[in-house]
Amino acid sequence: ETGGSGSVSTDLPESGFSACMESASAAYDTRCMLTALADEIVIPNYAQLTDVAKTFADASGPLGSYCSAISTAEESAAFADAETAWKGLVAAVQRTEMHAIGPASDNAFSLQYRLNSYMSGALSTCGVDSIAASSDVEINARALNTRGIRALDYLLFNSNLKHTCAPQVTSTSGWNDLSESERKARRCDAAMLIASDISDAASSIHAAWRAEGGDYRASFLQESNTFQSLQATTDAMFYLEKGTKDGKLGTPLGIIAACPDLTCPGFVEAPYSEHSLQNVITNLEIWNEMFSSNNETGFDAHIENEGWPEVSEAFKTNLEDALELAKSIDTSIVSQVNAIASQSDETECTNAYSNPDTTSDSFPMCTLYGMVKRIVDSLKIDFVTIVNVDVPGGSQSDND
């Protein structure tokens, strides 16, 4: 899938951008740019995610149908349908990763991490196993690193049905003695529980933005909050560095200091489905959309209005190049990490990301890292200077 926003069944209010510009005194207005961003990207993304997550978690939806089909002749076809729906859910979640602003970031990102806890630390596979092995689970009482789309990745795509807990963990003590079909069924039931939690979190964030709910939109677009909202937005967009560049590419590939070994496969975001590259693509696509909100405004217009059209064009070109390469790669991040097996391989990877204008035949994922790094370097210097915002904490210096 492309990660596009697609159709949204939830009724959306008309964008307030045009009305904002009618009262603006110049051809470009920062508050109006933020209005377009909120009304045409952020809120529609949460509306789309709410719809997709609700359908995925419904008992009669694709996941529920797969759970019912386990150990029947329809199991394979039902799983294929569930996998397609899961990809749509993951794409919708990955789009929201780039704008974890306000409600999604409140209380230490508690709602965002219910969607995807990747930025909070490693997935607790034992914790997920415990959910699958237990009855009457209160999902809200479970740790965030046992929930979200990574837990679904483990439950639905890990072919090894044995638990990963230590022997003293009582909840999983009899798990390995269960039949294969029983373990698959219980994992599927756990996936349904986690899918419902994702759906609830998505609905909560969407409601918090809407006028009928928490109306965070009004606060976000209040004239006196323009600078704070601009800063919050650019802080969120730095996910491109910490989440996409470093987390999904640099750390597992062993490029940055966060990985102390040759490679760090444990940091791959979606190791069981091998869907991590598509997540990178979706992140790049939504960042590109946020950079150029619509034909009349966006961060591109902001930068051009400040007198730096060449910087705006460079961002667009570099984003286009990175997306083109990412979509052309026919291997997974897991495979690329496994292929870096020696110091000479590591050197080849280093050369690849240091010279991203030439795609490496052996390690195109390292080339992609270099392309994303090029965008991030411009983000940390040109973008923050021209837009007049601060670099968020933790991004002051590069770490590769």
Summary of predicted features, one role per range:
Residues 1-15:
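Ser/Thr/Gly/Pro-rich low-complexity, disordered linker/stalk segments of secreted
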